[in-house]
Amino acid sequence: MTTSIKTSPRERKLGFRILFLGMFAIGTGQTLFIAVLPPYARGLGLSEVQVGFIFSLSALGWMLMSPYWGKKSDFIGRKSIIILGLIIYAFTTILMGLEFRLMESGYINLSTLFGLLILTRGCYGFLGSGAHSASMAYVADRTTEKERSGIMAVMGSAFAISGIVGPGLASAAVMLGPLVPYFLFGSITGFIAFLIFIF
């Protein structure tokens, strides 16, 4: 069985590695939010219910829109959806850091912060969820049936690995400042999106 899109072995390997880094960055960012966001948000005055709603909205958007973006990538291209998803993730992550900074500086109140966080995480869930589904479709396009499951398993392991090392990376970044992880991981993901664009 041949692949549906012809690429050289070198191009495939490089493309898969960059995609793996992208999925790892997103997975690490998710563990960042789980590890860092709740205690920090509570320290600013947000309740457990409010923090839970922020997480739930993002997860709902991811669940509902991932299939849509996967199908959309059939028409406008895998690469475009992957880049869009990574850029949205990078932008919303950095934006969350800025929103917290505005709250700390007294430019916005707690209610405004909560509303902004809902919009930001909702944007990530509904618009940024395409990166994962389009990445899996990208792999399917460039692998044979025999090798497809193995390579997809490797791609899927990016989230598992990020779940292991993510909290440690987040803790190390927090030592430089409570908002450093947002700017750091957002910038890294944006750079990966750039690599995919030029690739």
Name these PLM-found stretches.
Residues 24, 106-130:
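Hydrophobic core of transmembrane alpha-helices in multi-pass small-molecule transporters
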Residues 59-67, 163-164:
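Residue-level signature of mid-helix packing/kink "hotspots" within the transmembrane helices
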Residues 181-198:
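Symmetry-related core transmembrane helices of the 12-TM Major Facilitator Superfamily/SLC fold
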Residues 120-159:
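Cytoplasmic helix-loop-helix junction between adjacent transmembrane helices
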Residues 9-59:
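Helix-loop boundary and gating motifs at the non-cytosolic
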Residues 87-110:
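C-terminal ends and interior cores of transmembrane alpha-helices
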